[in-house]
Regions:
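Histidine-/acidic-rich catalytic cores in large beta-rich domains
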Residues: 1-213
Length: 213
């Protein structure tokens, strides 16, 4: 991800770290996570204990980072120590500190060995995609699931063909390119007692029709 200053946030999932790379000469400005971590963890180690992560992004004026922390290579139900999570961090580049703002765990306590995504929504909710665990979950900001969708068998791993690599939620307005369809029932062969049905399949913002004769 490119920053406003022209630098780059680079996620190295096999090294379990994030690096901010200078966009001019390519040197690392700082490293977050793994053995070369340069930040003081204010959350008892939970802020820097991520691995195999995906979809790392700056958030809120680049003082926050969100990501999907796979936290291991196992896929399926898991123990507390290896649960995948949606992770929201706050960083202070002056004090070189990092803390956990929020963690989002799957309601069924699962792990995703690969893939995954994290999207911060305008409402404050969070959409998480669970990669090799074929599911996606929307949470409120405080961590309450409000939508939990499972697209396949949990624990199928790489044999599962219903991965959820990324899931994005957005407002969508359907406006078909074709004209509405009309059906008229006129038992008296005139407008008396006649009924008119209108359908515009795909339109999302039609509340009522005004028929002008």
């Amino acid at each position: 991800m490119k920053t406003k200053a022209g630098n780059y946030l680079v996620s190295s999932r096999h090294l379990a770290l994030l690096t901010l790379i200078d966009g001019t000469d390519g040197h690392p400005i700082w490293i977050l996570g793994s053995k070369r971590n340069e930040f003081k963890d204010l959350s008892d180690g939970r802020a820097t204990d991520f691995s195999w992560q995906h979809h790392a992004r700056f958030y809120q004026n680049e003082s926050h980072i969100t990501m999907f922390d796979n936290h291991g290579e196992h896929t399926g139900t898991c123990r507390e120590t290896c649960l995948s999570r949606g992770l929201h961090l706050e960083i202070d580049e002056q004090e070189m500190t990092v803390r956990v703002v929020k963690e989002y765990f799957h309601p069924d306590r699962v792990d995703a060995g690969a893939m995954g995504g994290f999207q911060s929504l305008p409402s404050g909710n969070v959409m998480t995609a669970w990669g090799h665990t074929p599911a996606f979950v929307e949470f409120t900001y405080d961590g309450t699931p409000v939508m939990d969708v499972q697209r396949g068998k949990i624990g199928g791993g790489t044999q599962n063909d219903m991965f959820a690599y990324r899931v994005h939620k957005s407002d969508w307005k359907g406006r078909p390119t074709w004209a509405p369809s009309l059906a008229l029932e006129a038992p008296d062969k005139n407008t008396n007692n006649a009924k008119l049905w209108v359908s515009w399949n795909g339109a999302t913002d039609i509340a009522k029709w005004a028929v002008v004769c």
